[in-house]
Structures are given as structure tokens and as C-alpha cells.
UniProtKB/Swiss-Prot annotation:
GO cellular component: cytosol
Originating organism: Xanthomonas campestris pv. campestris (strain B100)
Domain MTTase N-terminal stretches: 6-116
Ranges of residues in domain Radical SAM core: 133-370
Main location: cytoplasm
Coiled coil spans: none
Name this polypeptide is given: Ribosomal protein uS12 methylthiotransferase RimO
Taxonomy of the source species: Bacteria, Pseudomonadati, Pseudomonadota, Gammaproteobacteria, Lysobacterales
Amino acid sequence: MSQLNPKVGFVSLGCPKALVDSERILTQLRVEGYDIVPSYDAADVVVVNTCGFIDSAVTESLDAIGEAMNANGKVIVTGCLGKRPEQIREAYPQVLAVSGPQDYQSVMEAVHAALPPRHDPFVDLVPDYGIKLTPRHYAYLKISEGCNHRCSFCIIPSMRGDLASRPVDEVLREAERLVRGGVKELLVVSQDTSAYGVDLKYAERPWRDRMYQTRMKALCEGLSELGVWTRLHYVYPYPHVDDVIPLMAEGKLLPYLDIPFQHASPRILKLMKRPGAVEKTLERVQRWKAMCPEITVRSTFIVGFPGETDAEFEALLEFLDQAQLDRVGAFAYSPVEGASANALPDPVPEELKQERLARFMARQAEISAARLEAKIGTVQQCLVDLIEDDIAVARSRADAPEIDGLVHIQNGGELKLKVGDLVDVEITDSDEHDLFGDALPSDPAAQPPRALNLQMV
């Protein structure tokens, strides 16, 4: 493209949903002829997509804005922290514009005002799958915005609004475009994947000569037709989650669920405004494992929530022992500006919160290590993410990018594996987080057209 094209620097912070917002803005910028540059110095203007979920994210976002202001001086701010424009303008009154999450039009208007486009969108084309910030072989697929829940520790609804589902045919067409562009793994994200379509009354829409409901199970059935890995994130533990487990058992959907349980004490869950039937949760986890023995269940928890007693923390540790989850993330509770949990009595001292967090993670590390050790001697289908010298770094079907473990393929160089390759790996060793093994030689031309037809041993 011409050197005269206006140049935009872009900083993307926050969760995968925010990453999708960034990708949509970047796609529109490229469609309109803007060059995306990797440095502040080379940019005519900088867009910062912020996060504002917890205090540390607010600090990171403000720091990023400040860095861009100091290095460039022309900065447009968007994203979740943009819902608090007074906080941004108090710190940096010279920012050009501030807008909230998924407000793509406002971002583009601000860019146009600061840097008019010099491009005819009918001449230069952008790939129909858009601009991606992830590696080419995987992509996040956002199916909705907002959330109807009012968890006491969370301010997402005040930032992103109530649930607004995308029509199922629109989502499936986007997934098709991504697969045409080389994506081999789709990561379904939202604030509440289980609630998908409830706001649209599960309306039916046509795709590929068939009618699909705007509902989680129907969406999964459609995605399974694309022949790539499909992974579900941010699933709320509703009973109808049971309906998608057979798709996992049949190899049509990755046997993986990311479900944030948050705690195991009924009283704490009630204070969090989360479902509190812990016995039913345990029964459901065991039922999923019976229906699909290969299933991986990942979850997140909050330790040290206001009022959490020693006994309630011990109940949380007992839950880990009983549930035998594969992957777990945990956070020590920290107040979030605007969250109703801030007003709860009996805050847990910071030192005690950190002590409990360490004990919690140590207990789960033992469980995860044992579950990974049990995979030694098995063959796992893996997707290569990175080549480091002679070792290929990959992920198994049990591992989402960034948050889960890795599979280190020792003979990756010998077999000339490439990023994006799907390969069967014999597992020879493990630790608390990762697996190690050797790829089995295969003729790429002989691989089945549907990646999900390969089953783990």
C-alpha cells in the first residue's frame, strides 16, 4: 500500500471478548485503507482498547493510555474503561475521544476526525475473515454481548449491558469465513454462553439449507459441521449444558467445558449471587464424566470473598478433592469499583487471602499433576502453536490457548512440524501443568478431512 496511507497504532487489553472487539475495529480500519503499525512513533494516531473489570486492569489501562500519550500524543480510548470517561479524562484530559465497549462506530468516527481516510474501499480488499490478533490457526468467536446476571463481584453488565445474542446464522457464517481463512480451532466466547439466544426467544434462522435455533446446542451442532476444533468458554452451569455433552462424546465438539463455579459454599455463593446447589454441581460434573470420559472441565474460583470463614474455605478445598477438575484458575478477591460486593461486611485480611490462595492452588496442583500423569502412555491429538528450535509447542484437545497447559513435542524438528499442524502425540512424561511426548509420523495427505474424527486413546 502507498506510504501516504494514514497509520494507526493499536493497543488491545483485556479478555477474549475485548480482543474480538479489537479485531472488528482493525478490520474496519484496514477496509478503509488505514495501515496498522506496531510502534507509537510510526503511528499518526493510537487507539487503546481498555479493560476495566478489576482494579489491576484499570491501572494497566491507564498506564497504557499514558504511555501512548507520552510517545505519540494523539490517543483514542475505547473499551470497558471507556464507560468511566471522567476517570480517563481526569488522568489524561488531552485524549481525543472516549467510547465504551463494542462502540465501533464511535471509534471509527474519532479516527476519521483525527485522521481522514485516503482510500477507496472498493479498490483494496481485506480478506473476508477480517483482521485477526490471534495466530492464523485459531480464533475467538464471540456469540453475544452483555449478561443478564448480577453477580455481586462483577460490573460487566454495567459496562456491556444485558445479554444481546447474535443471530445463529450470523455466527455460523462468521465461523465459515474463519475456517476458510485457515482457522483450525474456534473458541466460543461470551459473558454467558449457556444463555445464548434466550433474549431472541431462540429464534430459528437458516444456514446451509437447514433451520437452526439461536440456542447453545443448535449453535454447537452447526459449528460441528465445519470440521475444526470447537471449544466452549464461559459456560454457566445450567442443567441444559448436559445436552451438549453427547456432541463431545461423538467427537463433534471438543470434550472441554470452561465453567466458572467461583466457590463451593452455599452461603458465599448466595452472597456472590451465584447458583448455590453445590451437591447438584458435583452430580452434574460426575454425570458429564460418565457421559464423556475424555471431557476436560476447567473452572475459576474466588478465594477470600468477604465473610469467607475458615470452614467455608475448607469446604472449597473439599470441593476440589471431590470434583477432580482438570484445570483451575483462582483469584484472591479484590474490590471492584461499582460492585455491590464492596459493601459486604467482614472483609478477609489481605495476608489471609493470599495464604488461602496459595493453599488452594497447591491442592489443585496435586490434582492436575495426577490427572496429567494418567495420560502418560496415551496418544493425544495436538495442534501446534509454536516451533522452538527442535521442539514443537502444541496444545491437546484439553488445553485452551493462554490459560491451560502445553504439550512439548520433542521430535517436532525431526518431523518438520509447522505451526497449525494437527498431529497425534504419544505422551511420555508430565508435570503439574504440561505434557511431553513424541509425535507419531504420518502422511499429511492421509489425514482425515474432519479433524474431530480422530479420537484419543
